[in-house]
Amino acid sequence: MQLEFHQVDAFSSRPFSGNPAVVYRLDAWLADELMQMIATEHNLSETAFVVREGEAWRIRWFTPSVEVALCGHATLAAAHVLFEVYDEPGERLEFISRSGALRVNREDERLVLDFPAQYPSEVGSTVELEQALGLPPVDVLGSTDKLLVLLESEEAVRACRPDFAALARLPWRGVIVTARGLQKDFVSRFFAPAMGVDEDPVTGSAHCSLIPYWAQRLNKLSLTAQQCSARGGELWCRLEGERVSIAGHAVLVASGRIRLS
């Protein structure tokens, strides 16, 4: 048995930047264990599987080690594949996920994610967190299963060299570091060694928390963002009450088949 897959660089308009994700469009669900093994084989930060349900698509995301409840860049990648490879009609796709209903609109050359806003709240720093990051935070907030850590500058975000083993021992599945940007409204990086991903190149789901945080801090609803990982990526963001819009480009870089037997 063979399955067709497509690899997309999300939040980028050119190959070999942004965040890569593999997408499988399935006729029916595979066993959870098999989907996890496939994701482990690809060894990217996320592999997405989609199955049609009525007029919508149910979507699931797997890192190399675990299934996750929400992933932005792999949803963007899935929408790109459905539109560009499988010729889905219209300008809007509906996804059903563990995090609820998600929508992706095609607007000119960008895809726009409509995701739930996740408003962070103060939790305070700890010695363990500061030792893991290797520098003192300005502020620390919690949002669902992630920490949002404000640093003093974009330079500090770019220079951050965390101890990934120490981060993985914290009671959080991921850590966002962020600061006011020099060219963009804000910059960030995202570390998730507890999920098998030391650093995620561009993280749409992290912006569910970053957008409401920076919208309030900067007193503006529309924001530009850069995730300053080695691959990097640009995002155009907007706070819409209890929802956020996250826009970006995507490019197909590879297609192939995986043998299951």
Swiss-Prot record:
It comes from the Bacteria. The active site is at E46. GO terms for cellular component: cytoplasm. Pfam families: PhzC-PhzF. Keywords: Isomerase. The keyword Isomerase applies. The keyword Isomerase applies. One of its GO terms (biological process) is biosynthetic process. One of its GO terms (molecular function) is isomerase activity. Its EC number is 5.1.-.-. It is an enzyme of class 5 (isomerase). PANTHER family: PHENAZINE BIOSYNTHESIS PROTEIN (PTHR13774), PHENAZINE BIOSYNTHESIS-LIKE DOMAIN-CONTAINING PROTEIN (PTHR13774:SF17). Belongs to the PhzF family. This is Uncharacterized isomerase PA3578.
